[in-house]
């Protein structure tokens, strides 16, 4: 398929460059109602994505247009040629400043390791199922579960001579739990992504979700609190820290949507709490986003974004890095945040609201505004813990970063590895 597409590309006179990505995906899928298997299926599919580039000049300035099309392995040569012609035609209407394509390298790439590197993905799905349906003593129950396991063989070829192959892996589960011990039934949806079978990770996720389902069944509506320590946990932590990934991206800097400047402290002066130390890690164990190359075919390496709050580098794909005149890191989606010095127990010495689940945690990558309504939280008033819901918080990261504290304990959520909790002092909690 690759050779056929490239031979047809070379017949087009108006193409200045191209990038072809082919991916062969093998997967196993299982669907359960309670503990009963409802459906079990496997897939083996091939996809191709072709981007063509078309260069032109206006008033002495170089521009590069591009257009991407999907090509199916069932297409005839005539159909593929028509697709290519459509892409070439569309590319002339895209007017981006010129940028280069990735070039070949002799450096050796790492190999992602995974238990999903096997032809027997069904057995891996069974292991995941066993971790989900492990016996637990709880009043909340598992209502249903869906399991998706896949390995993907990727090849990237471009007109500059790049021709690389690598494998990536993805596991994904969706679980619905319910509990009927309160005044009304409670149902909670949870999901998780991973890149290798991990009984510990999956078992902990299910146990925590069952516990939270039971707590939510007994939760009372939150009261208004003018000032209290707020502890953000679970997936919202990853979303909170992702703000810094956005602010240090070359595209945000180029578009003047970022305050980040190389060599300057992003947190400002006189920081009272923990300082930010963030790295991009292309080969993070058990992350489905781990890959030795990005979609441009650029070799990926580890990079430090912030060191004690100081911006060390901007990151991103070739295009915007070229516009800024910085060395491209490539598109790396895994990031690691250094934990703090205090344990979760130490963070909870004073009264606090620990938010476990948001309805929809928002985080504006430009303004730094964050918050949302929470579905479940634990409020410690100094004497006892109250299970609460239907409250909300709002704040701004540019203000919060002057004094926030990270837990010593770490956790991983897909492509995030870092503190399990963040404490932000003196926040207002809206409620009744």
Q: What residues fall within each predicted segment?
A:
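Acidic low-complexity segments
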Residues: 4-7, 16-28, 77-166, 201-238
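Extended amphipathic alpha-helical scaffolds
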Residues: 31, 126-205, 251-277
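N-terminal alpha-helical targeting/anchoring segments
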Residues: 26-89
């Amino acid at each position: 398929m690759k050779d056929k597409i490239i031979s047809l590309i070379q017949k087009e006179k108006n193409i200045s460059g191209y990038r072809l990505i082919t991916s062969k995906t093998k997967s196993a899928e299982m669907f359960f109602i309670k503990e009963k298997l409802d459906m079990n299926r496997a897939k083996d599919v091939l996809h191709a994505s072709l981007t063509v580039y078309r260069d032109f000049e206006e008033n002495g300035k170089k521009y590069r247009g591009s257009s991407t099309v999907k090509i199916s392995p069932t297409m005839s040569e005539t159909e593929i040629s028509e697709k290519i012609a459509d892409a070439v035609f569309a590319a002339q209407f895209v007017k981006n400043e010129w940028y280069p394509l990735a070039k070949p390298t002799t450096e050796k790439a790492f190999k992602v390791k995974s238990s999903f590197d096997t032809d027997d993905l069904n057995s891996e799905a069974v292991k995941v199922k066993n971790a989900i349906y492990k016996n637990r003593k709880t009043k909340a129950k598992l209502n249903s579960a869906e399991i998706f396991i896949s390995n993907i063989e990727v090849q990237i070829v471009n007109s500059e001579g790049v021709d690389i192959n690598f494998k990536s892996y993805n596991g994904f589960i969706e679980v619905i739990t319910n509990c009927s011990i309160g005044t009304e039934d409670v149902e909670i949806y949870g999901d998780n992504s991973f890149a290798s079978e991990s009984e510990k990770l999956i078992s902990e996720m299910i146990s925590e979700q069952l516990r939270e389902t039971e707590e939510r069944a007994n939760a009372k509506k939150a009261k208004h609190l003018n000032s209290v320590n707020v502890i953000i946990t679970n997936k919202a932590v990853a979303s909170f820290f992702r703000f810094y990934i956005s602010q240090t991206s070359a595209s945000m800097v180029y578009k003047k949507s970022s305050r980040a400047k190389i060599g300057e402290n992003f947190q400002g002066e006189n920081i009272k709490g923990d300082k930010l130390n963030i790295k991009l890690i292309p080969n993070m164990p058990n992350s489905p986003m781990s890959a030795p190359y990005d979609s441009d075919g650029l070799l990926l390496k580890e990079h430090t974004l912030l060191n004690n709050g100081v911006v060390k580098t901007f990151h991103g794909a070739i295009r915007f890095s070229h516009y800024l005149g910085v060395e491209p890191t490539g598109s790396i989606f895994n990031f690691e945040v250094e934990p703090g010095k205090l344990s979760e127990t130490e963070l909870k010495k004073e009264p606090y609201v620990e938010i476990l689940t948001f309805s929809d945690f928002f985080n504006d990558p430009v303004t730094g505004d964050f918050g949302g309504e929470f579905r479940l939280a634990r409020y410690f008033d100094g004497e006892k813990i109250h299970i609460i819901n239907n409250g909300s918080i709002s704040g701004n990261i540019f203000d919060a970063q002057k004094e926030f504290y990270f837990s010593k304990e770490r956790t991983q959520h897909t492509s995030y590895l870092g503190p399990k909790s963040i404490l932000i002092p003196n926040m207002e909690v809206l409620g009744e």
